[in-house]
Amino acid sequence: MNIHEYQAKQILKRFGISVPEGVIVHSLNEVNDAINKINSKVIVVKAQIHAGGRGKAGGVIVSRTLDEAKTAIKNMLGSTLVTHQTSKDGQKVRKVYLEEGCDIKKEYYISAIVNRKHGQISIIFSTEGGVDIEEVAANSPEKVVTCNIDPIFGFQGFHGRNLCFDSNLSVDQTRKITSIAKKIYKTMLETDASQIEINPLIETSSGDFIALDAKMNFDDNAIYRHPEILELRDYDEEIPEEIEASKHGLSYIKMDGNIGCMVNGAGLAMATMDIIKYYGAEPANFLDVGGGASQQTVTEAFKIILSDNVDGILVNIFGGIMRCDIIANGIIAAIQEIGINVPLVVRLSGTNFELGKKLLDNSKLNIITAHDLSEAAYDIVNIVKK
């Protein structure tokens, strides 16, 4: 689950990390009151969307007068922002964050992620923070330092010193960055966050370190333990199909192609998308119905896929725990209930797959069955291309 920048800063502030003072604005009626709450000659207007790259896309504007700030807010609210992390259609700006300007001496980068390979939290640090951190990581990887934290011992002082060792930082700077890294680590543990990113972490001329921008997302499997964080969820920033899928226990990710996929198992779903691309088409989604899909689950899955205006659907099911004849009956019932006006290719394998295939073939519905995944992908791609 993702949250907005201003929400992430509220959490970081609770854990002792300094952030600029700011006010969230939802409508033009709130502008005057919001500006009056910020005691700064410089006001930074920031679009609040669940995507990075806002600075280069015009989503962060520094205003040095009240009129400039009001104009920026007026132009930004309700606009559509397109960044390298959004789709080509961009995301609508429904709220903006007004923040006091800061005296920036130096920009740094610091983040924490769950390192699944090592089963640890990794702290990442660079003295080259800012909007071009991706370029720094790609072109000068030696300027990006990673430190893995053993969960048995937790974050220790030497971890911070290791992060700063080759950065020519003073003892005082190292001490302050170590303190911030330790607080980020604690935040990760206590909130079940899967990522925390501060970019930039700025140093002011007075030597203070402030989180000028922040990003956080959380482990969906642990969010039930944090109702206060779940309340921060902004459904307007999420894809409607993905929200609907989660209500029915389906794992769904919207993509840019035109062939819908319904599969059981994440690995099989990825393989299905790969083979669709291999035959020259693009998948419209990742949809995993899980290992215990019922007729109702299959029906809801079809509804979600069809809401995306796909040109064809490929169903790829391996019957392990789930029997293929039950899935076949679910497919037939779903089609009879909602109707499907696009080509449908089904590949069944595993427990009772012969019976499942026979049920589909004898259903007198417009269903094409395939013997294996390669044949199924080839069939749906070529039918859609005609």
Swiss-Prot record:
PROSITE patterns: ATP_GRASP (PS50975), SUCCINYL_COA_LIG_3 (PS01217). Its cofactor is Mg(2+). Pfam families: ATP-grasp_2, Ligase_CoA. It comes from the Bacteria. Disulfide bonds: none annotated. Pathway: Carbohydrate metabolism; tricarboxylic acid cycle; succinate from succinyl-CoA (ligase route): step 1/1. It catalyses: succinate + ATP + CoA = succinyl-CoA + ADP + phosphate; GTP + succinate + CoA = succinyl-CoA + GDP + phosphate. Substrate binds at residues 264, 320-322. Keywords: ATP-binding, Ligase, Magnesium, Metal-binding, Nucleotide-binding, Tricarboxylic acid cycle. The keyword Metal-binding applies. Heterotetramer of two alpha and two beta subunits. This is Succinate--CoA ligase [ADP-forming] subunit beta. It comes from Ehrlichia ruminantium (strain Gardel). The lineage of its organism: Bacteria, Pseudomonadati, Pseudomonadota, Alphaproteobacteria, Rickettsiales. The gene is sucC.
